[in-house]
Structures are given as C-alpha cells and as structure tokens.
Amino acid sequence: MATRFRQTRRRRGHVSMGYGRIGKHRKQRGGRGNAGGQHHRKTWFTTFHPDYFGKHGMRVFHLKANKYYCPSINVDSLWSLVGKDVQAQYKNAKVGEEVPVIDCVKHGYFKVLGKGFLPKQPVIVRARYFSEKAQQKIKAVGGACELTA
C-alpha cells in the first residue's frame, strides 16, 4: 500500500521512533534466537518449553521389530469375533447366499489354525495365513478363505 509520507516523517516527535525506549534500535545484547535458555531466559524456557533441555531417552538401534509376529486364532473361536447376534442373523444362510465375513486381521489375528469345529454355517474368513486343516474345515461347511495383505 502506498503512503503519502515515509515512516520517519510520521514519527517525528516520538522520542524512540517506534524502536522502544530501552533498546533504542541498538544491537541484541540478550543474544540471538534461543540464546540464554539456561541463563537469563531460563524462566521463559521453563515456562513455555519445559522439555527443551536434557536427555530424552535413546533409540535402540540394535533391536529390530519382531518380523515373525503372527498372532493366531483357532477355527473354533472364529465366531467369537463377530458375536452371537450376527451368527443368529445368518443361521439359515445357504451356500451362494449372503454370508457373514469375519476379518481376522481387523481383530488382531494374522493366522487361522485348525483346532476345533465350526458350526455348519457358511462363512467367509479373511486372514494373512491359513493352515491346511483350517482351510479344509472352513470349506467343508461351505465357507471360503480369503488372503489379505
């Protein structure tokens, strides 16, 4: 925005010309930036940035995430993931009709194992891994096994 007068003309008569009465447009004697955080600006740092100084733990470079982490669930526990109301809703479902989908990965299980028995009710099971027995038992009741990433 263009103005008629320069700032110096407008500020005539004001002692400090907008630069404050103490510093009077002189250098930074307190230091620049975050200088003095543990000395003359300690109260400001402890109030607004209490965790700025000091150690904050360490990263553990030699430990890797467990690449073999694979929580599993057995076939006889599959229906417990969706609840009894869903099982009752699809009680009389036939093969080819709409059947419930049980997503094991969403519930925290990656692998489905074959222990136990499934109710004679078709179901679609999604998991990362299936044992052979689990696949056989799910397909025996008219269900399907879907692999997910």
UniProtKB/Swiss-Prot annotation:
Top-level taxonomic group: Eukaryota
Gene3D superfamilies: 3.100.10.10
Membrane-crossing segments per the record: none
Region of interest called Disordered, as start-end residue ranges on this chain: 21-40
Alphabetical keyword list: Cytoplasm, Endoplasmic reticulum, Ribonucleoprotein, Ribosomal protein
Self-association and partners: Component of the large ribosomal subunit.
Protein name: Large ribosomal subunit protein uL15B/uL15D
Organism annotation: Entamoeba histolytica (strain ATCC 30459 / HM-1:IMSS / ABRM)
Lineage, broadest ranks: Eukaryota, Amoebozoa, Evosea, Archamoebae, Mastigamoebida
